[in-house]
């Protein structure tokens, strides 16, 4: 099961996900215009965790931005960073469980995590 937690508005998020034919892969979407504070506040992540009734330790966030890493870390959710244009700083390196160079590395990472006995109920 997967969710989207974004600072982007609902209209723009759904437009982009539909255009990319990805919207059907997500069980829940929480957007920046639906929470009181956007990233780096943890509100979007806490909303997803609460709504989907998932333990933070059983969730895993994939993030491409520094503010997103900060938000997930502040929410107490393990985070994997996939740096976009800017490489991870020392702070983000400490706040993440792993840094990968591409989302293509995400599936093998999830397989490795499950093989090692860590069960993530949800990817955000």
Regions found by a protein language model. Give the residues of each.
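Conserved phosphate-coupling serine/threonine residues in phosphotransfer and NTP-handling enzymes
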Residues: 6-8
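Asp-based, Mg2+/Mn2+-dependent phosphohydrolase catalytic module
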Residues: 10, 14-124
